[in-house]
Amino acid sequence: MSYIPFPDISPELFSIELFGVTFALRWYALAYIAGLLIGWRLVLRMIRAERLWSFGPPMTEDQLERLLTWVILGVILGGRLGFVLFYQPAHYLAHPLDILKVWEGGMSFHGGFLGVMTALVAFCLKERISILPVADLLAAATPPGLFLGRIANFINAELWGRPTTLPWGVAFPGEAAQSCPGIEGICARHPSQIYEAGLEGILLFTVLSLLVWRRGWLHWPGSVSGMFLAGYGATRFLVEFVRQPDAQFVSAGNPLGLAWQISGYGLTMGQILSLPMILLGLYLILRSRRTA
């Protein structure tokens, strides 16, 4: 069976030791930082482009700088709490202090999304500005961060896919990745992180950019946010078919790791969380057109 060996890339970009304590910059942290900076520059560019707006941009550049702090808190707190609540509630209920160990991994996009939405609503109410136009700005600027995050997932050899015999399957390192029932020798898996980087990163960013800069969708508040939600939800739903579910959902009687099933058919937790995003996205698109 042909497969691609996992590249020998350290998850740490570099590390330094100060006063006997080692501090490391990991690719995952760099992806978060770069994603936020790129997103900030993209939003700033859209704010300055007057032709994109019917009645001017929804907020000032000073307000954008203040919003960035709120978004950072929403991403980190929401992403971590989402992982705790959606994927491993029993473990963290028994070991609550482990919630603080963010350096060990464990972030949920759906939780981060809810965290950012909460921060966005609170910020807009505080600043007395419209929520949907600001949400459109953030939605259009989010995919580059998703792309970088998925690449970091690949470098960390985490969130890999299900076993495959396809020639582009990757032999990820580690006992968990190589534990494939019914497969002897090397176990190759779908590089689902790369699939997601291409779909929710490159493809979604291309679509949203065309809608913003060529089709003028920022003139219809809520439409860009709706397309982002529907697009991300749909791509994540599809990738879940080849993505390895979290270990706590997998058992001898449930090898596919379905969080909900009936008569042998069901959905993974990622698919369950993506369905409301798709429905809300379609609703926002239709609503924006009716109120245009």
Curated annotation (Swiss-Prot):
UniProt pathway annotation: Protein modification; lipoprotein biosynthesis (diacylglyceryl transfer)
Q: Does the keyword Ion transport apply?
A: no
List of residues binding a 1,2-diacyl-sn-glycero-3-phospho-(1'-sn-glycerol) = R150
Q: Which organism is it from?
A: Cereibacter sphaeroides (strain ATCC 17023 / DSM 158 / JCM 6121 / CCUG 31486 / LMG 2827 / NBRC 12203 / NCIMB 8253 / ATH 2.4.1.)
Task: Please identify the protein, giving its name as recorded.
Answer: Phosphatidylglycerol--prolipoprotein diacylglyceryl transferase
Instruction: Tell me which Gene Ontology terms the entry assigns under biological process.
Output: lipoprotein biosynthetic process
Q: How does it sit in the membrane?
A: Multi-pass membrane protein
Subcellular location, record wording: Cell inner membrane
Q: Which PROSITE patterns match?
A: LGT (PS01311)
- Give the stretches traversing the membrane: 18-38, 67-87, 105-125, 193-213, 222-242, 266-286
This entry's Enzyme Commission designation comes to 2.5.1.145
The family note in this entry says: Belongs to the Lgt family.
Per its record, what are the GO molecular function terms?
A: phosphatidylglycerol-prolipoprotein diacylglyceryl transferase activity
Q: Does the keyword Transmembrane helix apply?
A: yes
| Role description | Catalyzes the transfer of the diacylglyceryl group from phosphatidylglycerol to the sulfhydryl group of the N-terminal cysteine of a prolipoprotein, the first step in the formation of mature lipoproteins.
Keywords carried by this UniProt record: Cell inner membrane, Cell membrane, Membrane, Transferase, Transmembrane, Transmembrane helix
GO cellular component entries: plasma membrane
Main EC class of this protein? transferase
Where it mainly occurs, coarsely classed, is: membrane
